[in-house]
Swiss-Prot record:
The gene is rpsQ. One of the primary rRNA binding proteins, it binds specifically to the 5'-end of 16S ribosomal RNA. Pfam families: Ribosomal_S17. Belongs to the universal ribosomal protein uS17 family. It comes from Rhizorhabdus wittichii (strain DSM 6014 / CCUG 31198 / JCM 15750 / NBRC 105917 / EY 4224 / RW1) (Sphingomonas wittichii). Keywords: Ribonucleoprotein, Ribosomal protein, RNA-binding, rRNA-binding. This is Small ribosomal subunit protein uS17. GO terms for biological process: translation. The keyword Ribosomal protein applies. The lineage of its organism: Bacteria, Pseudomonadati, Pseudomonadota, Alphaproteobacteria, Sphingomonadales. Part of the 30S ribosomal subunit.
Length: 86
């Protein structure tokens, strides 16, 4: 079975070798039909601490590394993002 790959925005890079990535998806409301946004946060492994808050990254599912980390960052998608901290 292929590994899942998701694209999202880094919302936190405060922990060592870990980033929190927010992945948004658009779904249609079952009754009213309006398109609404749903989001979920994933803890992803960042071995070199190179990804910063605000960047768009691609993450891939891996074997569990800890209680929360079952994803790893593959690559940076958007290089023009400006980090929120100095």
């Amino acid at each position: 079975m292929p590994k899942r790959v998701l694209t999202g925005t880094v919302v936190s890079d405060k922990t060592d070798k870990t980033v929190v990535v927010k992945v948004e998806r658009r779904v249609k409301h079952a009754l009213y039909g309006k398109i609404i946004k749903r989001s979920k946060k994933y803890h992803a492994h960042d071995e070199t601490n190179e990804y910063r808050e605000g960047e768009t990254v691609r993450i891939e599912e891996t074997a569990p590394m800890s209680k929360l980390k079952t994803w790893k960052v593959i690559e940076r998608v958007d290089t023009h993002a400006t980090p929120n901290h100095a």
